[in-house]
Amino acid sequence: MSVDPKKLNKEVAKRRTFAIISHPDAGKTTMTEKLLLWGQAIQVVGEVKGRKTDRHATSDWMSMEQERGISITTSVMQFPYQEHVVNLLDTPGHADFSEDTYRTLTAVDSALMMVDGAKGVEERTIKLMEVCRMRDTPIISFVNKLDRQIREPLELLSEIEAVLKIKCIPITWPIGMGQDFVGVYHLTENKTYFYEKGRGGEMTVSETREGYDYPDIRERLGALMFASFEESLELVQMALEDFDVDEFLAGEMTPVLFGTALGNFGVNMVLDTLIKYSPPPKAHPTNEREVAATETTFSGFVFKIQANMDPRHRDRIAFLRVCSGKYEKGMKLKHVRLGKDVRIADALTFLAGDRAALEEAYPGDIIGLHNHGTISIGDSFTEGEELNFTGIPHFAPELFRRVILKDPLKSKALQKGLQQLSEEGATQVFMPQINNDLILGAVGVLQFEVVAHRLKEEYKVQCIFEPVSIATVRWIHCDDEVALAKFKRKAHDQLSLDGGGHLTYLAPSRVNLQLMQDRYPEVTFSNTREH
């Protein structure tokens, strides 16, 4: 399809695609809500705490998430802000869903890291930062919960620098905290932004004043606290380096803002910083070449599959990140892995669970494709060119359970359910070659609960899981057919096929795995598999 290069460049420059990363309970879902409020994508803020009402947080749309108050699946939300188009990918904050989160981070151009001001850098944040590091993702930092007692801001900054190995450049500095939270002082604007309590559900423009030294602020904080604020501010100003955009884009430096997501204070500053500094859609690597966002032919890759987004339509949606060109309704695309041309007439755009038919989409946008079992995570779609996007892995699960069906007559429904749920990539199914068992592998215990809950709710299948003596799994590759055949004969009892039909070795112990690797050096035992 003919695309006007000028218009394409303009649309690419307007896009900002980012994800929020944080430890559970750092306020990520609340932040998502408030960002949507500023983007005027929602009128009523359904705060997460309102569990007794029907107004659950917009981005937690699966019933189990609403019961538990944790984000399990990655939602995608698009909203306008200051003549830009913002695509926000909400990632699961719960530790068990790291694989889904990892793949989401392959589809964004920057990330917002949220730190709980009372707790500082937590373990989950460290893990997610490692993923961002691998891709040099630019990071904006937000220290949350200033309306409560938090740790000393200087101490928090040193911890972020020491633990996450990233240079911090404060953009704002807090004046007081908890009951005495006055607001923030903007270091480059030399202005104080005042916090007003009880305005969390509204878009309010804060009162601002030049500088920070005012009698009412001194009175509110008291002499001791005001002196402590001035002292910390002086230290920050003395040590403050200039903000270096190149260092930020390389993921080596992070601008830091302070505020409260619940109180909707500092959220618009996050959006302003995102628009000002974060990069528009970047080039993406493929096995064949690098694809620039401004190329006029369409290309994109699938980073996530979600079954049953709408229980009313038993459907599966493949989430595709547009990498280049323009999607237009009804266009013909090549599904590269299958070598087939498909006409995409009904792609979707999202506001967490609300789906709207899409007329056009540009690089950086996330679109939903209806999937009837033919699309897999990692698949590329192009206007004909043979391109395979790289860097979207499957990880070896760490926990395994045998699936026991309560009603043997439902084995077909069970297989279908497990197959579809494993296509989403949070769990993996293995079929041992010596029996008819179904083995489920996951990164964390919570995933087994989620699968059982969803099989019951969405597929009307009840099952239980029992422990199985598998320590880990490895994908098997071997170019030497004779050596592979010999290995298959000897290891037959431990071999299985995964959901995609790939040969895997189910190791009963780490020692056994090491022995097999030593015994068969020509066989590759891989702990990840690219999609």
From Swiss-Prot:
One GO CC term, this protein: cytosol
Protein localization: Cytoplasm
Keywords per UniProt: Cytoplasm, GTP-binding, Nucleotide-binding, Protein biosynthesis
Binding site for GTP: 22-29, 90-94, 144-147
GO biological process: regulation of translational termination
Annotated NCBIfam families: prfC, PRK00741.1, small_GTP
Family: Belongs to the TRAFAC class translation factor GTPase superfamily. Classic translation factor GTPase family. PrfC subfamily.
Stated name of the protein: Peptide chain release factor 3
Gene giving rise to this polypeptide: prfC
